[in-house]
């Protein structure tokens, strides 16, 4: 086996830096063993929950909706973040045309999208601390004749709920996964500037609180990822009976134990996040390219794949939504006297993050080095502000046996543990709705089978050859 493992590191394809999400290597490990093992772990987790939770009073003692305080933005950090956004847009227009030397694409795709998401799952909703949108709202209100209410705008969103976030996140995913040059500094600067105008207009029309709560996709996204974090702000009453908050520790993913149900649009948003990161991996596989008549060994570039990838992105979301719907239908068929918990969608959030971590990890380890170098000379004027301009990017760890194995095991662990967490969360939520436990077992079987199947799919994505 060691000979097999040693052999594949010599045929690793060169890491492609044209897109922050590309995987740096193809793993040719004995995949049947690892895929089967990962699926077995998820299945055994479900059995364990039946044995332990079903025979105890845990169902009656599950605490939903922990007294969590929504993190409020820090004004000076918000203004600093907005200023940084304007500077980055300027860098996109005036800086180096090479995406790997321009701070805008590196900050957007590597530091913010990959890095901040990972940090949020550990430390909580950092985005709320640094979000530029509150500062943008205050800036708008300074203009004569404009009054921006934090609660109400000119119009009410009514029943739109999360649908604007769904549409905007789909456009963002299309830019990342389908657009021929998502890292082009000039293109990215224009798109971010347009999005800034859209956000400002929406806050003016609908009110900043209303828009940011359910419609601004990244505020929604980071809030959901923060539910995975063991760190949160806990509300507490002080001596004079006033509300206060303090940093507290909880079990990872316990923030997902919530009684309020997401509306259909909120469910669609979670499924969209999950389907986009899945299609990101699928779209580079030899299987997908061959399906579209493309020779994977002579990959012509993303331009010829714009239409197939657009259709594929939509189809992946449709498949995920259909699978989610059928899971509920089958669960109800198996036990018509007990409807499956509508909060099941919360259990899919760990899976979305697990795929995010596993999918982006190799590229992040390399591309973050480019970002650190670019920070020292953002305008390509020969500066060395932080002493990193002379650094050399190292990707040699992607061809070293020990480091490659470590990366692959981290990816496997992320996917398997994400599904384990999903099974536990789904079971606890269902058990809360049916504390007697036994009647809820049948309802959980379709969801567990879905997660086992998705575990197999995710590990296959990690192991199958891809075109870079």
Regions from the language model: what does each represent?
Residues 456-468:
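Juxtamembrane boundary at the C-terminal end of a transmembrane helix
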